[in-house]
């Protein structure tokens, strides 16, 4: 004997059903659902000609559009005698397959008002629609009404509820529902179990989902290809590729042949989690088993190989797929074009672009961004701008990445005005620049000596709510210091120290250099000495900067002490360290110390730089040095 619905669903579900069934009469199914369709639907429906709906139903509803379906409903409700509930169900089912669940619910309520009696199949359709809209309480209310009318829920009814629970963040209710179904004589089928497995993965319960596959078999319900596909997909999304591969062996033992979709899922996951060789091995295995790879298989592998710089392997795969008459798609071309651009093989990238155009594959924003980047990298800025304008003409509108790439290219080529113009154009197009946009332009303006506009762009960045990062501040401080704006740089630096911005050694080095260049070597020294208290370790550039500052004030003993500290505690001195000290001692007239430093530098396999050799040559010309110094340097 079948159980009552209150025994099947969880206690929470039962309370909702009873609450909806209190009082006399039938509950209103969905008080607001009519409004979801809009009354315009009904105007269209009832103004349509009735026609012969039977012929339309016989011919099938697979290609029917929503407006036509609503028009057909209007004709059916006006027909006399009324069509059977079976015929109404066919129409409701067709609309449900269009995923127009709100329309189905509204039509169902219209039928009720016209006293067209619903059957079990009608209730199943409506319950499924409520569940697909995550309106579980309304689905349960309708279930209660259905049972009150004497209809017993079928496995289809309960599977719809199960699906609703799974997608409505009520996975514990879903598990309880399946358990109670089994206890009370219902026999969950493969679809039921697969739905629950999918729900468990949605709620990050992977181990329970995998265990349920074994429970299915124990209960005499064999998992099918769809079930295994759901499990493989769930495992791969979590990065559990080993478990996914083990599942392939289980499928083989159960004589269920994995299809290309399952192999693609695992290959894609292996690629994402950096197991490219394992992905290639699985690719070979699927070919051995007679499973033909498709464009998705090749695209995943090519994209992965490109991301690891294995562009020759990627090119070989492209040749293989073309030879096997598998047409590459947009993803395939994008991966290869981007890889060739980054490898500096721009001629090959352009050839691929030409090839995809010949194949009538329309480039997307990613394609254009890669090519614009390539043109900028090769200082072909006019060509980059042409590509930019061409993509606009093709209704592929530039994004922030496109603008950032072009602005960076123009600023690097000292065409800052062009970069600034692009920045203004972004605003006109309604695009808000990101941190990279503003930082790039600020750097370009500083390099161009336009300190005032660089500061204005920084202020605009803050007022636009775009957060500066450590790179922005580093560029701002460096630009201010190099343009003689130390006081302004100190204001920014003080703000950074008081805020929660974590300062790195590059920021401190920039400020030390700015202080030393402005003649405030004592302030630079104080900041340098405070680094250990701040838990920041100076690098070789910091030491060299401080040594240079000390040397500029002829504090050579202090500078030499820093060299000694570097040799003892690290970081080890480099060519710049020695050359700075050698020049300082030469200018001070201390030939012996200079000679000793040159010998030490040469023992470390460093050589004199252009500035040192130039100074020695001038002193030789003036007769202040003999040729032995030049011989020592070279």
Curated annotation (Swiss-Prot):
Keyword vocabulary terms for this entry: Repeat
InterPro entries: Pentatricopeptide_rpt, TPR-like_helical_dom_sf
A GO molecular-function descriptor: adenylate cyclase activity
PPR repeat start-end pairs: 49-83, 84-118, 119-153, 154-188, 189-223, 224-258, 259-293, 294-328, 329-363, 364-398, 399-433, 434-468, 469-503, 504-538, 539-573, 574-608
Family, similarity comment: Belongs to the PPR family. P subfamily.
Name listed for the protein in its UniProt record: Pentatricopeptide repeat-containing protein At1g62590
Species in which this protein is naturally found: Arabidopsis thaliana (Mouse-ear cress)
Organismal lineage: Eukaryota, Viridiplantae, Streptophyta, Embryophyta, Tracheophyta
